[in-house]
């Protein structure tokens, strides 16, 4: 199922779409509905390739509102972990997502290298897991930055800056 809602954060419109079947299978967000729908279809395709059965039939749910509450800081990221299905996610990716969500709190960042050290792996492996994160905002991949700048973000650098600024992050270099 798919549930989509539009929210406002200050002057910015934010669209949030959640794919679910019992639990959350994937999350997408964008600043306009057209981009959101493209991201939802890309996410559904990615999950489908990983063996996840997806339905994009529209059905209202409270999931977009909950993701929005995480976005604006009214709901802690880690408290939302139990809502995620982790279908189509490798054991390594799940480990990375859970560690990041539980340990890198709102308003802070961690470098790819430091996250890799914490998990005894390589920065490249961490970067790959971040790129494939099906739960943006909730699993805060936007909080993972390069040692010399903001780094990459699948949804776009403008979106990453927006998320960090909402959380009060002023600088993202070490």
UniProtKB/Swiss-Prot annotation:
Keyword line: Cytoplasm, DNA damage, DNA repair, Methyltransferase, Transferase
Sorted alphabetically, the Gene Ontology BP terms of this entry are: DNA alkylation repair; DNA repair; methylation
Compartment(s) of residence: Cytoplasm
One CC-aspect GO term = cytoplasm
User: What's the EC number here?
Assistant: 2.1.1.63
CDD domains in UniProt: ATase
Is-annotated flag, keyword Transferase?
A: yes
Fetch the Pfam families from UniProt.
DNA_binding_1, MGMT_N
Biological role stated in the UniProt entry? Involved in the cellular defense against the biological effects of O6-methylguanine (O6-MeG) and O4-methylthymine (O4-MeT) in DNA. Repairs the methylated nucleobase in DNA by stoichiometrically transferring the methyl group to a cysteine residue in the enzyme. This is a suicide reaction: the enzyme is irreversibly inactivated.
- Similarity comment: family membership: Belongs to the MGMT family.
NCBIfam families xrefs: DNA_protcyst_Mta_Thcoc, ogt, PRK03887.1
The record, for PANTHER family, names:
METHYLATED-DNA--PROTEIN-CYSTEINE METHYLTRANSFERASE
Other observations noted: This enzyme catalyzes only one turnover and therefore is not strictly catalytic. According to one definition, an enzyme is a biocatalyst that acts repeatedly and over many reaction cycles.
Instruction: Report what the protein is called.
Output: Methylated-DNA--protein-cysteine methyltransferase
Q: Which organism is it from?
A: Thermococcus kodakarensis (strain ATCC BAA-918 / JCM 12380 / KOD1)
């Amino acid at each position: 199922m798919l549930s989509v809602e539009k929210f406002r954060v200050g002057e910015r419109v934010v669209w949030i779409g959640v794919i679910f079947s019992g639990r959350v299978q994937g999350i997408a967000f964008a600043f306009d509905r057209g981009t959101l729908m493209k991201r939802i279809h890309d996410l559904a395709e990615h999950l489908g390739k990983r063996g996840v059965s997806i339905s994009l039939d529209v059905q209202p749910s409270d999931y977009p509102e909950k993701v929005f509450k995480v976005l604006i800081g009214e709901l802690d990221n880690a408290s939302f972990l139990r809502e995620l299905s982790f279908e189509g996610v490798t054991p390594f990716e799940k480990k990375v997502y859970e560690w990041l969500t539980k340990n890198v709190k709102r308003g802070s960042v961690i470098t790819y290298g430091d996250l890799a050290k914490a998990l005894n792996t390589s920065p490249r492996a961490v970067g790959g897991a971040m790129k494939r994160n099906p739960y943006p905002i909730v699993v805060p991949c936007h909080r993972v930055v390069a040692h010399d700048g903001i780094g990459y973000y699948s949804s776009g650098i403008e979106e990453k800056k927006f998320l960090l600024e909402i959380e009060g992050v002023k600088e993202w270099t070490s």
